[in-house]
Structure formats: C-alpha cells, structure tokens
C-alpha cells in the first residue's frame, strides 16, 4: 500500500494526475509545515492582498496612502467614502470594525444585511440578504452556493471560524412565495458578503434556496479522522488538500504533498481550486498555474440581472497597478549545459547577475548583483579592514583576456556583515556590498548587468529542483580556472546526512549531484546558486559558502539560504530594490 501511495504522489507532482482520494492524513500533509501554522496571511505560502505587504513572513496592513491612487470610489459601513477599494480595505485591515458596504458613493438609506431564516438556532438557516440599492430582502440561490460563499456569510454574521463542513441544516416544507433568488459569487477571503458579486435569477421554490450551518465551537467535538485548522475549527481530513478552503483561513490547503479531487497542486505545497488555473492571475507563488495557457476560459451564463459591482475584478485590477520590480530575466537564454567543475566557459550574457570581487591579488570571490548599488556575497569572503581595496568587476567571462570595453569596474563604499555571522560554523555566512556612486549620480550604472531576484519564501524551490551555480573557482584537481563557468546542480534535502550537526537547515541549503560530477569549488565562494521559476524568472537561491572535497561523491556544496535573509536584506537595501511582488 505504501508503494501505491508513493507512486500516486509521483504522478501528482510530475504529471498533475491528482484525482485520487487519500485514506491517511500522513499521505496528504507535511507535518513540519503544519507545525508552522500557515494561513491566508502567511506570505511564505500565498501572495498578500493588494492592501497588505509581507513583513517577516506575515501579510500585514498597508497604510491607505500606500495603495494605488487609481480606482473607483467605495462606501464603508460607517458611511465614509473612500477614493478606492484598496484604501477602504487597508483601513478595514487596520480597524476591522468598519467593512465594505457598496461600490460608489454613500447614501443615507444604503444598508446591506445578512440573516439566517427558518433555523432552530441563530447559527443555521436559509440565507437571506438585503442589498444596498434594493427595497426588499431575497434568498440566496442554492445553485451558486459553495464553501467559499458559506464561509464569508458566516464570517459576516460574526462566526469567526466560518461555516460548518459536517453539519447540515434540515429544512422542512415551507411556504415561501418567491420566484427569484440571488446568485452570489465570492472568492472566499472576503470579510463581508457585500464584497461578493450578486445577480438575480429565477427560482422554482424553497428547495432552490441556499442554507448554511455556521461553525460553533461548543457544538463540535473532534472526529476520529479530523484535521484541525489553525483557527481552531475541525474538519474531516478528507476535506484537507482538495483545493477548497474549508477552514476559512486556508490552513487546510497550505501544507500539501498532493491534492485530492480537482485541486491544482503548486510546487510550494499549496492546493488551489482547479478553476484558478489559467485564469489570468498567478495564484501559486511559483507561477506554474499560469504556464502553458492558450487563453483565459470564458464562462457563458444565463441571462441575468447584475445587481452589484464585481469587487474581485477590482481587486485584480488594483493588483495589476502595484509596482513590479524588473529582475531575473535575461536578454538571452543559454542553451548549453556545462559543468562548473571540469566544464567550459560561460558566454557573455549567460549570467548577467554574476560579479567578481577583486583585490590586489586578483579575483578572490564571486558575488550577485541584486539591484541598485548592491552586491550579495558570502561574509567569509570579505574583511572589513580591506573595504577600500576591493573592486567589483561585472561582465567578466575571461580573466586572462578581459574585454575592457564591456567590463564595468566599481569601487566599494561599505560592507555590511550579518551581525550573527559565525566564522567557525559558517552560520549566517552572508554580507552586502554597497558600491560607490560616481560623482553626483543617484544610482550605479551597470548597463550590461541584470539583477537576480531575491526570494521571499523558503517554498519557492524544492529538493530535486535543478539550479545553476557559477564562478571562477578551481577544478577538482585544484587546477586554477580563469574563465567563468557554470553548471547545473540539484537541490538536496536536509544535508545533515552528509555533514551531521555542522549543517543548519534553516540558514543553509545543499546542492550538487550524488556522484559529485557537478559542484562548486574553492574560489567560487560568494557566488550565486540561482534557480528559475515556472516563468523562467531567476532567483538567487543560495550564496556559495562551504563544502568538502569538491567534486567528490557524497560531499555536496553548502550554500547560504537567501530566502531566510529576505527581511535582513530588505532592511539594509530598501524593500523597493528587492520586492518583485507585493511583498
């Protein structure tokens, strides 16, 4: 049976064949990941909303002035008008008591309400809504009702854990004279049902009306086969990792080895709804949900009367207005595959983020250009007392015959060592170099250099992903190399099996090949280990740090894990220089 589960997991990861049902929670979820209690506010796993930003792994509220200025006016429940939806949501994020009311200006009589009718308790019943510009209340259509809408409705009613996935509302025969109902569509993370899109539909009777049971902690005890959400809610383990946000805080979809049902599995271990694939919006932080899409699917709907604005479309529009950093995209793509140990030289343009750190003796280490005037490298490469002696050389592919017309030489203004760098253990082996600006210039000019992106999440790349290491290091016979070389290596899971307690999993990364045929070596230190996401955007995943017996089996190279230092880097260089997305 275990072999069967392993085979199914292989199909899910490599062939996206994930239409199976798992019998054990261990088959589905990563325990180490679950222990970190990720939710929809964990930017290691998900993108923050446009009115939030990522700080130390958590989506926190922006201030309203940090939102894009373009947009349509909206009204909040306190009758205050806001120039944009983003500004209203930003203030709501800071002060949760005030919610979205309607798109457009505020009116004295405008009111939105949600209530549950014909239930035995205040936590269950048929869902009835009064829209702002409608005179009467209407029931919600059952045909459009899902856990997304149910969770939002219950949250709007004050049930913080959303809807109950186990209990069902038993509806007896009712005499309701209504020929219409409201079709509602939510994304599932709205804080009020007013943010969802409503259209009017015809109905045949009360059987067509949506009902819900909201989750009440006192009414539920753990099941034998339960999954506990981060918010304290219990759901069946069979509802975890299926692409449906049953928990309401998304914690059941963020630590998944594979996906059940129709869920789409992101490499970062997140399950998203299958309809999010190829919908024009990147939902996987690794981007693969929008790769290979011929076009966006259009949905044909029956003739309806649209009653409210599409605020999810407005959210996407605001997201498109956020500044995006240009990094990690080369002007030319390499097509050859060479080894850094025993390989041939790189071509001009293959590695536009690679720099050489030179002192009086020659190239001592490599470095990575990350934008502005900033170079990322290894702390062990540098000495504070030699700051004025270092030079940064860019566009160097041949150290013996340098192309001086193309090479740009910059001098070092200052070096920032990680405050917890340990020269004995190589912990926190990372440093920043700020290059001097020429004259009165505001920035450094490196016309042929392209910055590598700085990763914000440790889940962007996984063991067995293929990445590239580069440098001017020695070959395995200790022979000096004078041309820039690069080679492909695979990320290797926890290297404690090779290096024991000298390997610190949180701040170190392992990469190489099990036969040692490709490796970084002496002289490559400080240089880049770069990985490309599904859209061929390059991230500096590691900084060459240390290793033993380069090019020998069972001695993979050890790198400083850059994602662990995103906040440290952004603190020193400024977040706009390294934040590719809204993070």
UniProtKB/Swiss-Prot annotation:
Kazal-like domain span: 55-108
Summary of the tissues where the protein is detected: Expressed in the liver by hepatocytes. Also present in other cells such as monocytes, fibroblasts or keratinocytes.
Alphabetized SUPFAM superfamilies for the sequence: Kazal-type serine protease inhibitors (SSF100895), LDL receptor-like module (SSF57424), SRCR-like (SSF56487), Trypsin-like serine proteases (SSF50494)
Cystine pairings recorded for this chain: 33-255, 43-54, 48-59, 61-93, 67-86, 75-106, 141-181, 154-214, 186-196, 229-247, 241-256, 259-271, 266-284, 278-293, 327-453, 365-381, 373-444, 467-531, 495-510, 521-550
Residues annotated as glycosylated: 70, 103, 177, 464, 494, 536
Active site: 380, 429, 525
E.C. no: 3.4.21.45
Domain (SRCR) ranges: 114-212
GO terms, molecular function: metal ion binding; serine-type endopeptidase activity
Recorded consequence of changing residue 418 to L: In CFI deficiency
GO biological process, one term: complement activation, classical pathway
Top-level class of the enzyme under EC nomenclature: hydrolase
Keyword Transferase applies: no
Residue numbers binding Ca(2+) 2: 276, 279, 281, 283, 289-290
Matches recorded under InterPro entries: CFAI_FIMAC_N, CFAI_KAZAL, FacI_MAC, Kazal_dom, Kazal_dom_sf, LDL_receptor-like_sf, LDLR_class-A_CS, LDrepeatLR_classA_rpt
LDL-receptor class A domain sequence ranges: 213-257, 258-294
Domain Peptidase S1: 340-574
Keywords: Age-related macular degeneration, Calcium, Cleavage on pair of basic residues, Complement pathway, Disease variant, Disulfide bond, Glycoprotein, Hemolytic uremic syndrome, Host-virus interaction, Hydrolase, Immunity, Innate immunity, Metal-binding, Protease, Repeat, Secreted, Serine protease, Signal
Subunit and partners: Heterodimer of a light and heavy chains; disulfide-linked. The fully processed and mature protein circulates as a zymogen, and is allosterically activated by substrate-induced remodeling of the active site. Interacts with C3b. Interacts with complement factor H.
Similarity comment: family membership: Belongs to the peptidase S1 family.
Disease involvement: Hemolytic uremic syndrome, atypical, 3: An atypical form of hemolytic uremic syndrome. It is a complex genetic disease characterized by microangiopathic hemolytic anemia, thrombocytopenia, renal failure and absence of episodes of enterocolitis and diarrhea. In contrast to typical hemolytic uremic syndrome, atypical forms have a poorer prognosis, with higher death rates and frequent progression to end-stage renal disease.
Role, per record: Trypsin-like serine protease that plays an essential role in regulating the immune response by controlling all complement pathways. Inhibits these pathways by cleaving three peptide bonds in the alpha-chain of C3b and two bonds in the alpha-chain of C4b thereby inactivating these proteins. Essential cofactors for these reactions include factor H and C4BP in the fluid phase and membrane cofactor protein/CD46 and CR1 on cell surfaces.
Name of the featured protein: Complement factor I
């Amino acid at each position: 049976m275990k072999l069967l589960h392993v085979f199914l997991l292989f199909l899910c990861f490599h062939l996206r064949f994930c239409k199976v049902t798992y019998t054990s929670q261990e088959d589905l979820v990563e325990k180490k990941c679950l222990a970190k209690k990720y939710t929809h506010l964990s930017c290691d796993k998900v993108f923050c909303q446009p009115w939030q930003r990522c700080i130390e792994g958590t989506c926190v509220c922006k201030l309203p002035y940090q939102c894009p200025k373009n947009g349509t006016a909206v009204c909040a429940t306190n009758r205050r008008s806001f120039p944009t939806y983003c500004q209203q949501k930003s203030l709501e994020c800071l002060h949760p008591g005030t919610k979205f009311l309607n798109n457009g200006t505020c009116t004295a009589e405008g009111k939105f309400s949600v209530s549950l009718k014909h239930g035995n308790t205040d936590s269950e019943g048929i869902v009835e809504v009064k829209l702002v510009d409608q005179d009467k209340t209407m029931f919600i259509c059952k045909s459009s009702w899902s856990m997304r809408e149910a969770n939002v409705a219950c949250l709007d009613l004050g049930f913080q854990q959303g809807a109950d996935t186990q209990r069902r509302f038993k509806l007896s025969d009712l005499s309701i004279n209504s020929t219409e109902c409201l079709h509602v569509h939510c994304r599932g993370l709205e804080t009020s049902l007013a943010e969802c899109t409503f259209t009017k539909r015809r109905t045949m009777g009360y059987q067509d009306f949506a009902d819900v049971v909201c989750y009440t902690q006192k009414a539920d005890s753990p099941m034998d086969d339960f999954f506990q959400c981060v918010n304290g809610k219990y759901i069946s383990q069979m509802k975890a990792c299926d692409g449906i946000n049953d928990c309401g805080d998304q914690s059941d979809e963020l630590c998944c080895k594979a996906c059940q049902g129709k869920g789409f599995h992101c490499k970062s271990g997140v399950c998203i709804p299958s309809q999010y694939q190829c919908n024009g919006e990147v939902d996987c932080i690794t981007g693969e949900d929008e790769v290979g899409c011929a076009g966006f699917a259009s949905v044909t709907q029956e003739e309806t009367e649209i009653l409210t604005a599409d605020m999810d479309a407005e959210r996407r529009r605001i997201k498109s207005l956020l500044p995006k950093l240009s990094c990690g995209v080369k002007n030319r793509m390499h097509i050859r595959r060479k080894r850094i140990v025993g390989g041939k030289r790189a071509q001009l343009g293959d590695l536009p983020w690679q720099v050489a750190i030179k002192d009086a003796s020659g190239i001592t280490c490599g470095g990575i250009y990350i934008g502005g005037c900033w170079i990322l490298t290894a702390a062990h490469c540098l000495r504070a007392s030699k700051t004025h002696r270092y030079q940064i050389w860019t566009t160097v592919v041949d150290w013996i015959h340098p192309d001086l017309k193309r090479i740009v030489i910059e001098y070092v203004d200052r070096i920032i060592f990680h405050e917890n760098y340990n020269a004995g253990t190589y912990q926190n082996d990372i440093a920043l170099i700020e290059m001097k600006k020429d004259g009165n210039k505001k920035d450094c000019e490196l016309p042929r250099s392209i910055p590598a992106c700085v990763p914000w999440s440790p889940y962007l790349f996984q063991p067995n992903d293929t990445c590239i290491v580069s440098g001017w290091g020695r070959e395995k016979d200790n022979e000096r190399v004078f041309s820039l070389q690069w080679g492909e290596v695979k990320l290797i899971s926890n290297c404690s099996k090779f290096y024991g307690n000298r390997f610190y999993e949180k701040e170190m990364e392992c990469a190489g090949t099990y036969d040692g045929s490709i490796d970084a070596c002496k002289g490559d230190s400080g240089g880049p280990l770069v990985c490309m996401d599904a859209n061929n955007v390059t991230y500096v995943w590691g900084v060459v740090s240390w290793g033993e017996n380069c090019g020998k089996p069972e001695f993979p190279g050890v790198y400083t894990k850059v994602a662990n230092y995103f906040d440290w880097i952004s603190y020193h260089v400024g977040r706009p220089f390294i934040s590719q997305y809204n993070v």
